[in-house]
A protein has these predicted regions:
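Generic detector of short alpha-helix boundary/capping microenvironments
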Residues: 7-8, 229
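C-terminal motif of bacterial Sec signal peptides marking the signal peptidase cleavage site
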Residues: 15-18
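Bacterial Sec-dependent N-terminal signal peptides
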Residues: 1-7
């Protein structure tokens, strides 16, 4: 049986996120894969372990969210409410990052892409500042990076034992959100592969191949895939994704 889910992606380290309706008629999951809708993953953890945090334990972040009354400060123990933000849509919020001495060290935009059971947070760093003097660093080149991928993991007992699931949706890297991603997971032989097309900039008019990778059990009780990202057969990096949702509804 072949089924379909919707999928979106932040493409810097080629991190993917996807949503669907496993167990409730998978064939209908692609009726509106690009349409924003309410609900979905509700809360971001700002701190965290294993290099998956938005800020470090001694840092403070100021986030500007007009829907929540303007700019507020948060530390690594705080959670950030995104329940009012729409799924299948990139939400961009201005931020300032402060070090342990409360000195501003960078500013830019947080790009949040959320689905039903997961969220991906990217950071467009537009300015950097000296952590001691607070002066802006000249000739700084802005860049985009994926900061955190989090959500409700698919547990071992919940992973499908058979069938091919096709994940489709948006591919984006910062302000470039015109790309399309297509990824298949074969739960019968536990492998996955796909492509990214339509990105601008360095990858304009090129197909990024997400080479076949094995679906394996990660640390405690969740599953993921890691493989090579190629252009014209040449390795250009790696991609990593994990399964999210009670019925392998999403990958991120």
């Amino acid at each position: 049986m072949k089924t379909s889910h919707t999928l979106g992606m932040i493409a810097a380290a080629l991190v993917l996120s996807a949503c669907g309706s496993a167990g409730r008629g998978l064939g209908g999951a692609l009726l509106s894969p690009f349409d924003p809708k309410p609900g979905g993953y509700a809360t971001l953890n700002l701190g965290g372990d294993n290099g998956n945090s938005i800020i470090k334990k001694d840092e403070t972040i100021r986030i500007h969210d007009a829907e929540k009354g303007g700019t507020k400060s948060y530390n690594a123990n705080d959670k950030f409410d995104i329940s009012h933000k729409k799924q299948n849509k990139i939400t961009s919020l201005g931020f300032e990052l402060l070090n342990a001495n409360k000195q501003k060290v960078e500013s830019g935009e947080l790009d949040i892409y959320k689905l039903s059971y997961s969220a991906v947070v990217g950071k467009r760093i537009q300015k950097r500042f000296d952590g001691t003097t607070g002066e802006e660093i000249k000739n700084f080149n802005p860049y985009f990076t994926v900061e955190s991928v989090q959500g409700r993991f698919t547990k071992e007992a919940e992973k499908p034992k058979s069938g091919i699931v096709n994940y489709q949706g948006i591919a984006f890297a910062g302000q470039d959100n015109q790309g399309r991603l297509n990824y298949n997971i074969n739960f019968g032989n536990n492998t996955g592969s796909g492509t990214i097309t339509g990105l601008k900039g360095e990858f304009h008019k090129q197909t990024i191949e997400l080479a076949q990778a094995d679906l394996t059990k990660r640390s405690s009780d969740y599953y993921g895939l890691s493989g090579d990202a190629k252009i014209n057969g040449n390795n250009r990096g790696e991609y990593h994704l994990n399964l999210f949702g009670p019925k392998a509804d999403e990958v991120a």
